[in-house]
Swiss-Prot record:
Residues annotated for nicotinate binding in this entry: Y21, T210, R318
EC number: 6.3.4.21
Pathway(s) of this molecule: Cofactor biosynthesis; NAD(+) biosynthesis; nicotinate D-ribonucleotide from nicotinate: step 1/1
NCBIfam families named among the record's database cross-references: NAPRTase_put (TIGR01513)
Family to which the UniProt record says this protein belongs: Belongs to the NAPRTase family.
Presence of the UniProt keyword Kinase in the record: no
Function in brief: Catalyzes the first step in the biosynthesis of NAD from nicotinic acid, the ATP-dependent synthesis of beta-nicotinate D-ribonucleotide from nicotinate and 5-phospho-D-ribose 1-phosphate. Helps prevent cellular oxidative stress via its role in NAD biosynthesis.
Protein's cellular compartments: Cytoplasm, Cytosol
Modified-residue entries (Phosphohistidine), positions: H213
Organism the protein comes from: Mus musculus (Mouse)
Cofactor list: Mg(2+); Mn(2+)
Name by which UniProt lists this protein: Nicotinate phosphoribosyltransferase
One Pfam family from the record: NAPRTase_N
Tissues in which the protein is found: Abundantly expressed in the small intestine, liver and kidney.
Length: 538
């Protein structure tokens, strides 16, 4: 898709990023005289993704930006006129030209919130024709963002708090927009950085990266740097011929490792020297272009030790093939002994980064106790979400003209919850999460310490709950087209997501066969559902 940027340098989603049937329904509403009827839709999901027990809500900021800028251009209206019946009343197209979101109100979960099945991520109210047109773009903006954020959060739970996670999936993503979105929301979900420089430029995602095998293999060893001299890190003292110092160190390193001096690949060494001259304060080596043990490691050590003499410290190595866990263990052992042998103790703590199509199961290995891996680069498994490539969000009508609406189907789990609703989160005395409650908006809010009878979804029996704390979940972000409160930054949403995840009970954080987090209905909402299920919609 053509990338169009707004005044803040962010990508624009246009109103015609939608399904044709939204336009045909809009014409139907207009012909029926119902275009301006008050209506409310809810955007939610029915099942937690990846077989888990939670999701993270994401994409709200993108939704607000889309809604505030919503306007059909002349070219948009002309295209719709070309695909709708030729005898369509021109007044309908004039109605479309005049549309904006000045009559739209949105309540939503804050970005980065824990979300559970059936609880609205967004509540969108306004004129029926308009809020119907918003369905597909809002689903597009929320579903993938929430899926990637949830996937990233799961990977962060596996990795634990100490491992650095680098998202590096841009080249594996489903197109440039998918790659850009994944970089943003994997960061929100708990990754530390991304390789995607556009995400860094436009959304402030920290960027990181190393070097590729192409850089290493492009050198043969015969290259002579135009300027081989390097000044000490302190800027005091004479400059040093770095390639010459590296060759001297190589002799000592090979003797120490029991290698012939000819074994380490000269082209690889030349590549490392070139990189070190360009980045003396950020030198890192990719060790597996030829042989980790016989070439990559000794070449890296020779360059790192030569830099160390000048007061610089290498910042890491990366492995991209083989048994990553075992190799990292062996390399760490050599770093420890080499640091002592050559009196450069900082070598012992040089970070070891790994990549190579890492998925959840491999991440579990790399994160196990005693692992010497420090940084884990994940691409395909975070951006494509292979375990579940779609969030399954839906956007359903819940009221028209102030009257509740319900969808009754042959599949009971696809039945909707009618009416305008409020949502609350109940917490226990220790601050852990107990359940989420859905009730009609007209009901008084529940209070802490108040015993309530509620109906957990998926059960036929009520239960009694007495929360120590009650938190309203849905906040008013857009009222009559006006933003009601400043939207948090990406970093603030990321911190909020991590804080929210910390409140989940361990049983709900399990990635395999987790306990189901309960979502319950108030007695009044349950009674309305039963009534409409028996009688059909009002």
């Amino acid at each position: 898709m053509e990338m169009e940027l707004d005044s803040e340098g962010r990508m624009v989603v246009r109103p015609l990023l939608t399904d044709l049937y939204q336009a045909t329904m809009a014409l139907g509403y207009w012909r029926a005289g119902r275009a301006c009827e008050a209506a409310e839709f809810e955007l939610f999901f029915r099942h937690c993704p990846f077989g888990g027990s939670f999701a993270l809500s994401a994409g709200l900021q993108d939704c607000m930006r889309f809604l505030r800028a919503f306007r059909l251009r002349d070219a948009d209206v002309q295209f719709l006129a070309s695909v709708l019946p030729p005898d369509t009343d021109p007044a309908f197209f004039e109605h479309l030209r005049a549309l904006d979101c000045s009559g739209v109100t949105v309540r939503a979960l804050p970005e980065g919130s824990l979300a559970f099945p059936g609880v609205p991520l967004l509540q969108v109210s306004g004129p029926l024709l308009l809020v119907q047109l918003l369905e597909t773009p809002l689903l597009c903006l929320v579903s993938y963002a929430s899926l990637v954020a949830t996937n990233a959060a799961r990977l962060r739970l596996i990795a634990g708090p100490d491992k650095k996670l680098l998202e590096m999936g841009l080249r594996r993503a489903q197109g440039p927009d998918g790659g850009f979105t994944a970089s943003i929301y994997s960061y929100l979900g708990g990754f530390d950085s991304s390789s995607n420089t556009l995400a860094g430029q436009l959304r402030g995602v920290p960027v990181a990266g190393t070097l590729a095998h192409s850089f290493v293999t492009s050198f043969s060893g015969s290259e002579v740097p135009p300027d081989p001299m390097l000044a000490p890190a302190s800027s005091e003292g004479p400059t040093v011929d770095l390639p010459a110092r590296v060759n001297l160190w190589l002799k000592r390193v090979c003797l120490y490792l029991g290698l012939e001096e000819q074994e380490p690949h000269p082209g690889e060494r030349a590549a490392f020297v070139a990189y070190a001259l360009a980045f003396p304060r950020a030198f890192q080596g990719l060790l597996d272009s030829y042989s980790v043990r016989r070439s990559g490691l000794p070449n890296f050590l020779a360059v790192a030790l030569a830099l160390g003499e000048l007061g610089y410290r290498a910042v890491g190595v990366r492995l991209d093939s083989g048994d990553l866990l075992q190799q990292a263990k062996e390399i760490r052992g050599i770093f420890r002994t080499a640091g002592a042998q050559f009196q450069m103790p900082w070598l012992e703590s040089v970070p070891i980064a790994v990549s190579n199509n890492i998925d959840e199961s491999e991440l579990m290995r790399l994160a196990q106790k005693g692992s010497e891996v420090n940084v884990i680069g994940i691409g395909t498994s975070v951006v494509t979400c292979p375990k579940q490539p779609s969030m399954g969000c839906v956007y359903k009508l819940v009221s028209v003209g102030g009257q509740p609406r319900i969808k009754l189907t042959e599949d009971p789990e696809k039945q909707t919850l009618p009416g305008s609703k409020a949502a609350f989160r109940f917490l226990g005395p220790d601050g852990s999460l107990l359940l989420d409650l859905l009730q009609l908006a007209e009901e008084p809010p529940p209070k802490a310490g108040q015993e309530l009878r509620v109906w957990p979804r998926g059960t036929q029996e009520p239960c009694t709950v007495k929360p120590a704390q009650v938190e309203p979940l849905l906040r008013l972000y857009l009222q009559q087209g006006q933003l009601c409160e400043p939207l948090p930054s990406l970093d603030e949403s990321r911190r909020f997501a991590q804080q929210s995840l910390s409140l989940l009970r361990p049983a709900h954080k399990q990635l395999q066969s987790p306990a189901v987090y309960p979502v319950a209905l108030s007695e009044k909402l349950r009674a309305l559902v039963d009534s409409l299920s028996a009688r059909g919609p009002l």
